[in-house]
């Protein structure tokens, strides 16, 4: 259901802003209300949006249920998954405003990726994930072979890593 926008007058001293509210039509969806799982998914998506929004252009405030998101940039988003930098070591790189990634050791020794292309979550990965991971694993294989004189496969390295990627 789309309602008529509510436009209110504010004092001239108030900075201009746009506030977008989401109110699901429970009847249309055939549900009585939002479950805890649904709320969790919506909250995750709000954090996703906060992570991929370019906060340098404008001071954007993103919130959920009247509470501002703690995520102010992509690095904050990575912290939600693996803890802060002092708890979990990671490598972070931002080559330009279009590519940004972080690598950390996977806690469960299974490759995991969290990636976005143009602000859209690509939970199944894709060519962008392969592109970055192939470069990382190839360089690590070369480094380990040169420094430690041990031959390892890219797959054995990949399964130990967690990749966060925004492009």
Language-model segments: residues:
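GHKL/Bergerat-fold ATPase module in large chromosome/replication-associated machines
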Residues: 59-159, 163-167
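GHKL-type ATPase core
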Residues: 1-72, 76
């Amino acid at each position: 259901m789309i309602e008529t926008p509510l436009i209110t007058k504010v004092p001239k001293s108030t900075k201009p802003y746009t506030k977008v509210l989401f109110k699901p039509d429970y009847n249309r969806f055939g549900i009585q209300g939002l479950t805890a799982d649904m709320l969790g998914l919506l909250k995750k998506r709000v954090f996703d949006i906060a992570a991929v929004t370019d906060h340098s252009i404008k001071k954007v405030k993103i919130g959920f249920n009247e509470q501002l998101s703690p995520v102010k940039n992509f690095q904050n988003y990575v912290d939600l998954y693996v803890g802060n930098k002092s708890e979990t070591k990671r490598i972070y790189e931002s080559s330009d405003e279009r590519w940004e990634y972080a690598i950390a050791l996977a806690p469960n020794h299974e490759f995991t990726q969290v990636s976005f292309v143009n602000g859209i979550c690509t939970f199944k990965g894709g060519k962008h994930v392969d592109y970055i991971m192939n470069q990382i694993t190839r360089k690590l294989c070369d480094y380990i072979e040169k420094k430690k004189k041990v031959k390892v496969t890219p797959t054995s390295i990949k399964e130990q890593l967690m990749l966060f990627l925004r492009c």
